[in-house]
């Protein structure tokens, strides 16, 4: 039997790349051949090749918060990227092209449509990004993590890796747990400057109550470590990137983090109370992602403009392990654990029509 082939388009941020990688690895297990389209010097260029997946690089940038100069020359980059992806499609002849949202998906989505290759989209967020909004008008099939985001889209959930799904539930994790409250701090795959600045101060004021496992991002590791060391806070674990995030979730009583779609999905699947500081996009995309968990009492949302040391200290002082256990159970009730199977069924069904 000739194996099916798929091109996955995702790049720029972990929120697009990691769900795409989960899908890619599952498809490979099922005998599919996978190629990837991304950009150089970005998260996908560092991660995807490690899994033996061939990645093709295109030159394209996002338009959000860009300069006037970049806006003027952006059509040139888009056109070049379009022809680059079209050449890849013509050469490799995939059965399916899957766009995970973000600027990397744009040129390839149009190229696949122009080449009459089925275009599938997956939207992770509660508010669709610009690229997926545009491409949803020409796509063969739309998938979404939550209802009502893209037109005529099937709700499938967000795919997460099996190691996260296998994390013990809150009842088993919190059983007989004692000692300092364990707080996981993650600013997304790139880290977060504001959390790196504030959390050492919080740790100093609550050093008798809290221990942090803090992901700083690659660029601020040494700077953040110096802040902790200056305050003589040696009990905390400070790292640039947590490779085994499942073990970190299993360890934690609470997480302080951004509210990217994948992070929110993972927290729900694991069952973990959260303090969310949404990235302040104009469309409040991350705020919307976190609202369901806040609504059921599993999380608190703090706008970045209101974030300060005193506020975090007051919230943490109001919590104990019993309260965090209740928050964790509430979060666990919203977890979607079969997303990868739902997505595979959609891909497989469309591929049989080609």
UniProtKB/Swiss-Prot annotation:
Belongs to the glycosyltransferase 28 family. MurG subfamily. It is a peripheral membrane protein. Its main location: membrane. This is UDP-N-acetylglucosamine--N-acetylmuramyl-(pentapeptide) pyrophosphoryl-undecaprenol N-acetylglucosamine transferase. One of its GO terms (molecular function) is UDP-N-acetyl-D-glucosamine:N-acetylmuramoyl-L-alanyl-D-glutamyl-meso-2,6-diaminopimelyl-D-alanyl-D-alanine-diphosphoundecaprenol 4-beta-N-acetylglucosaminlytransferase activity. Pathway: Cell wall biogenesis; peptidoglycan biosynthesis. Pfam families: Glyco_tran_28_C (PF04101), Glyco_transf_28 (PF03033). One of its GO terms (biological process) is cell division. Its EC number is 2.4.1.227. It is found in: Cell inner membrane. The keyword Lipid biosynthesis does not apply. NCBIfam families: murG. It is an enzyme of class 2 (transferase). Keywords: Cell cycle, Cell division, Cell inner membrane, Cell membrane, Cell shape, Cell wall biogenesis/degradation, Glycosyltransferase, Membrane, Peptidoglycan synthesis, Transferase. It catalyses: di-trans,octa-cis-undecaprenyl diphospho-N-acetyl-alpha-D-muramoyl-L-alanyl-D-glutamyl-meso-2,6-diaminopimeloyl-D-alanyl-D-alanine + UDP-N-acetyl-alpha-D-glucosamine = di-trans,octa-cis-undecaprenyl diphospho-[N-acetyl-alpha-D-glucosaminyl-(1->4)]-N-acetyl-alpha-D-muramoyl-L-alanyl-D-glutamyl-meso-2,6-diaminopimeloyl-D-alanyl-D-alanine + UDP + H(+). Cell wall formation. Catalyzes the transfer of a GlcNAc subunit on undecaprenyl-pyrophosphoryl-MurNAc-pentapeptide (lipid intermediate I) to form undecaprenyl-pyrophosphoryl-MurNAc-(pentapeptide)GlcNAc (lipid intermediate II). UDP-N-acetyl-alpha-D-glucosamine binds at residues 13-15, 125, 189, 242, 261-266, 286. GO terms for cellular component: plasma membrane. CDD domains: GT28_MurG.
């Amino acid at each position: 039997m000739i194996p099916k082939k798929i091109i996955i388009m995702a790049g720029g941020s972990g929120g697009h790349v990691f769900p795409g990688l989960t899908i890619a690895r599952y498809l490979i297990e099922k005998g599919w051949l996978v190629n990837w389209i991304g950009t150089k010097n970005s998260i996908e260029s560092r991660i995807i090749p490690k899994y033996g997946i061939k990645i093709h690089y295109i030159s394209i940038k996002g338009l959000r918060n860009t300069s006037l100069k970049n806006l003027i020359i952006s059509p040139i980059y888009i056109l070049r990227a379009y022809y680059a992806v079209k050449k890849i499609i013509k050469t490799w002849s995939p059965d399916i092209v899957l766009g995970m949202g973000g600027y990397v998906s744009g040129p390839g989505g149009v190229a696949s449509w122009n080449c009459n290759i089925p275009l599938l989209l997956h939207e992770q967020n509660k508010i669709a990004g610009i690229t997926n909004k545009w491409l949803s008008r020409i796509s063969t099939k739309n998938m979404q993590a939550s209802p009502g985001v893209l037109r005529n889209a099937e709700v499938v959930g967000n795919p997460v890796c099996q190691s996260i799904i296998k994390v013990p539930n809150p009842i088993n994790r919190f059983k007989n747990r004692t000692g300092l409250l364990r707080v996981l701090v993650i600013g997304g795959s790139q880290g977060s400057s504001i959390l790196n600045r504030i959390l050492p101060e919080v740790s100093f004021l609550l050093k008798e109550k809290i221990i942090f496992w803090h992901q700083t991002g690659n660029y601020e590791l040494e700077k953040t470590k110096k802040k902790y060391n200056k305050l003589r806070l040696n009990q905390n674990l400070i790292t640039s990137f947590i490779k085994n995030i499942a073990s970190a979730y299993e360890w934690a009583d609470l997480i302080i983090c951004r509210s990217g779609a994948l992070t929110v999905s993972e927290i729900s699947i694991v069952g973990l109370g959260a303090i969310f500081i949404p990235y302040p996009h104009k469309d409040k995309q991350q705020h919307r992602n976190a609202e369901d968990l806040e609504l059921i009492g599993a999380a608190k949302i703090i706008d970045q403009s209101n974030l300060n040391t005193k506020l975090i200290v007051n919230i943490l002082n109001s919590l104990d392990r019993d309260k965090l256990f209740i928050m964790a159970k509430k979060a666990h009730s919203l977890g979607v654990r079969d997303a990868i199977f739902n997505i595979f069924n959609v891909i497989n069904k469309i591929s049989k029509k080609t």
